[in-house]
């Protein structure tokens, strides 16, 4: 235990906090704590309570900073970051691939074991996600000696957002040459080469994209979705019905070329959804695919949620709502989106 942890462990305030959590099992609002104390304090709460924790920060900058501090104190498997771009144009158009990879790793980690600290912020906590049970069932589990139809695997990879390429170089890509499937999962540092003998997996091994040489063999591999957006044909039918209803409501609000562009855009997006294309951009339609999308909180059974500087969190949430409304109004006027039906 370092000096700071020793100091905190002896404080009466910490004991009062622990007792409160024992009695009420409630969420916590923390403020007025020296910034450098948050990480060791959260570490001690986690180790004492032994339950999943979601730490809510006001923005991405503060979430990243706290995460970096926690990583210095704890095992990396016990701490995760769930980051999200904070600009409305990023949400509606395309967001950082680095942040997306971080989110996918975090979701996969939660599915595997919930008992961890996840640091997020307003934009991350409010982002709609594929329902947890659907996301859990979406991954592909491969095992040496298992029988798999290669064409079916290729189809499934496309559904999960993987892109077919000639040679795998980046996360989210796959290629097929004869009876060899190369795929770069979102949760791994290196791609995987799967060699088939007829329909049976003969070997699974990690390899280097630079040298193409094998790194090590494994008996099993899991291929998780490349995007938070995972859906079936049933959801596609729901989406098409819902988006066309909204298009009917929106069309009278614009005219001429703007209306033509709106129809072209929406019908183009319908085809993209059907063909699993541009899934990061198509994420804006998740509420039309699912009746009740989940959020990060929904991926946990009984988390302790700790809000740090709650007033700033509320302020940031209000600003985000205002920005989203302004973007929606402008996008409708310019034929870039459809109205929300309430």
Can you say where each PLM-predicted feature lies in the sequence?
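ASCE RecA-like P-loop NTPase motor cores
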Residues: 1-342
